[in-house]
Amino acid sequence: MKEELLKRFTKYVKVDTQSNEESTVCPTTPGQMELANILVTELKEIGMQEVTVDEFGYVMATLPSNTTKEVPVIGFLAHLDTATDLTGKNVNPQVHENYDGKDIVLNKDLNVVLSPKQFPELANYKGKTLITTDGTTLLGADDKAGITEIMVAMNYLINHPEIKHGKIRVAFTPDEEIGRGPERFDVEAFGAKYAYTMDGGPLGELEYESFNAAGAKLTFNGNSVHPGTAKNKMINAVKMAMEFDAEIPKEEAPEYTDGYEGFYHLISLNGDVEQAKSYYIIRDFDHLKFVERKTHIASIAEKLAEKYGEGSVELKLNDQYYNMREKIEPVKEIVDIVSAAMRNLDIEPKISPIRGGTDGAQLSYKGLPTPNIFGGGENFHGKFEYVALESMVKATEVIIEVARLFEEKE
């Protein structure tokens, strides 16, 4: 299993599938369709049935039931794209066997070092096989580790018919990193009662709570006048944007919050005297607090518009996804089954809220309750991203055990 995981993973990460928020097509980048087509070929090769890919890059396939029991159809999902934070082009994975717990020099020329001083969790991986970047790109374990684990688990089940399971559906989706993954996902065609995204982090992670999420696009319209004659005439749009940001509680930012704490996050601010634009994301687990945060943003915009005049501040506020806990708690047994599967494999489940979003958050609201299971990676979205091969083995075993337990309980 280890060899197959390593071979598939290092192949998949070399395909540049970084998504692009500026694109209006789906998938937003051609590399995602390239990987989708590779996976279609490989799914057929291992013996999966009903293998399809649509024009938008959504891959679906079926592993038929091998039991006489009536077992609910379950699904496993992972996303094709990698994050926009750092390039995913020319990924050159480095394999470090029997990690010694010390610094790993990712790139000598650029002095990029993966160090336990900066990342103390590396101590957990002593003696393991780590797959890292070469210090110039992200790795793409988010979520090509998940893709790999699903592929290997399906191959294992096909080759071990003594493990009884119901019908299993798998899907690989585009553009998750920019929040568009579920937009064109056909829940009815997928046909599962429950599903799981293999999109979590370290060993044992199990998540069924996500943020409520919104985005706020602000445009500040100023009045540019020659600075020599600007008195009582100039309105500096950049300063308006700064004034707006000064009204946001400084301690309610990502760098000061964790656990169940929500935040406002200024993603970008650019412009000049005439016009400036800023973009915030708003996050909270509690729905009432989420509404309060959006109201606060709107009230600041209104206050500045009153001060600087009609048309001076434009706000576009849009909800992005909601806390999936509301949709999963009524069917909490799907979380309990994963916990049991992990314990059967000597993994301690680490149930915590996702300080982010997954496709599962939106899919849960489309009628497909979808918790999130660990994929094994650490330090996603950057050059220090890595994954332990042993964690990928465990994630693969969890998929197999979940399928077995669903059949066993019927």
Swiss-Prot record:
It is found in: Cytoplasm. Keywords: Aminopeptidase, Cytoplasm, Hydrolase, Metal-binding, Metalloprotease, Protease, Zinc. Zn(2+) 2 binds at D142, E177, H381. GO terms for cellular component: cytosol. CDD domains: M20_peptT. Zn(2+) 1 binds at H79, D142, D199. Its main location: cytoplasm. It comes from the Bacteria. Its EC number is 3.4.11.4. GO terms for biological process: peptide catabolic process; proteolysis. It is an enzyme of class 3 (hydrolase). One of its GO terms (molecular function) is tripeptide aminopeptidase activity. Binds 2 Zn(2+) ions per subunit. It catalyses: Release of the N-terminal residue from a tripeptide. InterPro entries: ArgE/DapE_CS, Bact_exopeptidase_dim_dom, Peptidase_M20, Peptidase_M20_dimer, Peptidase_M20B. Its cofactor is Zn(2+). The active site is at D81, E176. PANTHER family: PEPTIDASE T. Belongs to the peptidase M20B family. Cleaves the N-terminal amino acid of tripeptides. HAMAP family: Aminopeptidase_M20 (MF_00550). This is Peptidase T. The lineage of its organism: Bacteria, Bacillati, Bacillota, Bacilli, Bacillales.
